[in-house]
A protein has these predicted regions:
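Hydrophobic alpha-helical transmembrane bundles of multi-pass membrane proteins
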Residues: 1-400
């Protein structure tokens, strides 16, 4: 029976890893559909290459930073318990690789290709796993200290803060240091519209992310005996809440409609194992509204050129999710309890602060040492031709 349980657990978390791996296709198509046609190839290549670099760096360095264990032992030892530790690495890698995928959407259309790969390596090798180890592996006694002060540890079941808020708040200084796309905000005060190049591809990306998210959340249990239907239904309710609110507040704009469910899912990750489904619905509704309001503010009023709105979507909705777990996870609001609002505020603030510092240091250093932004000429030409020497539809542009 023990062998059967080990095999089932390995299969369970492997399937979770595959589902979250598929989410990276969602990141790619969401970005492809949002950017202009001259940057579509770049969007696809970036996500795949970022994932590949993340895999190597997380295997060699990042996983050890987070969990204090490495893979520099014999294959016989690695294969123990049906290779559970290896597939656990695979699953957690897909989370780590989401960080550069999130950042990619914010810096799209004008970031240099190679400096971003260096940033990916540093972020996935150290910046992200440092906080991951604090939140999920009791590093440095931070969780014990939070529990001493508040009575409970910081709770983040599936990464509202650890993954999404950290990714979004790293992206914010990256976007600001990079600056806006050429002529996005004109000297006369007007804003040049850059509408999505393909709503169908944007929608495809959103749907792939939505489906994969159920692996992201449900399989965060990591073993089969800890699986909970509550996590699945809470994820569903937050998703639809975000969709409906974004539909209403975004005035039926398809970009908002397809990002609304993602906002809800980002926010519910932290407390999806604790909340009542109606609480999850409220969390998703708030997240959908938060995304629409803050995306509009950042783009139009504050003139922060965050192309996919990754700071509102992941940074702010992830922050809300960390806090919401302490509100709607409480027994007084129908949750399972065992969570504390003060603990959630402390853990969330720590994650946000670390991400801001990490983003500022990594992208600030790269800006000084090698530059992070394309020239106006390269940007005008587009990243597809500038970096990859081919456009998304060469057959339509050149007579062979």
């Amino acid at each position: 029976m023990e062998a059967l349980k080990q095999g089932a657990d390995a299969l369970f978390i492997l399937l979770g890893g595959i589902m979250v791996l598929a989410m990276h296709a969602g990141f790619a198509f969401l970005e492809l559909g949002t950017v202009r046609k001259k940057n579509q190839v770049n969007a696809l290549v970036k996500i795949l290459v970022d994932f590949s670099v993340s895999t190597v760096v997380y295997f060699v360095v990042g996983y050890s930073v987070a969990y204090g264990t490495g893979f520099f032992v014999g294959a016989e030892q690695l294969a123990a318990k049906n290779g559970y530790e290896l597939v656990k690495f695979f699953f957690l890698l897909t989370f780590a690789a989401a960080i550069p995928a999130i950042i990619s959407g914010g810096i799209a259309e004008r970031a240099k290709f190679w400096p971003q790969l260096i940033a990916t390596a540093v972020i996935v090798g150290f910046v992200y796993p440092f906080f991951e180890g604090i939140a999920w592996n009791q590093h440095f006694g931070v969780q014990a200290w939070i529990k001493t002060v508040t009575g409970d540890e910081f709770h983040d079941f599936a990464g509202s803060v650890v993954v999404h808020a950290v990714g979004g708040w790293i992206a914010l200084p990256a976007v600001i240091l990079l600056g806006a796309r050429y002529n996005r905000y004109r000297k006369d005060g007007q804003i040049s519209a850059h509408p999505p190049s393909s709503i169908p591809f944007l929608a495809l990306g959103a749907w792939i992310l939505i489906v994969g998210w159920f692996g992201f959340n449900v399989m965060s249990a990591q073993t089969l005996d800890k699986i909970s239907g509550l996590v699945a239904v809470n994820s569903l309710m937050a998703m639809v809440g975000g969709t409906i609110t974004a539909l209403l507040m975004g005035k039926n704009d398809p970009g908002f409609v397809h990002n609304g469910p993602l906002a809800g899912l980002v926010a519910v990750c932290a407390g999806s194992d604790l909340m009542h489904p109606l609480g999850a619905l409220v969390v998703g509704c708030v997240a959908g509204a938060l995304f629409v309001i803050m995306f509009t503010l950042t783009q139009n009023k504050w003139k922060i050129d965050d192309v996919l709105g990754v700071w509102p979507l992941h940074g702010l909705c992830g922050t809300w999710g960390g806090i919401a777990a302490g509100i709607f996870g409480s027994q007084s609001l129908g949750g399972l309890g065992g969570v504390n609002l003060n603990a959630q505020l402390m853990g969330t603030a720590l994650g946000v602060g670390w991400a801001l510092l990490g983003g500022l240091v990594v992208y600030g250093s790269l800006k000084v040492l090698m530059g992070i932004k394309m020239s106006p000429e390269e940007e005008y030409e587009g990243a597809d031709l500038t970096v990859h020497k081919i456009s998304a539809t060469p057959d339509r542009e050149v007579s062979w």
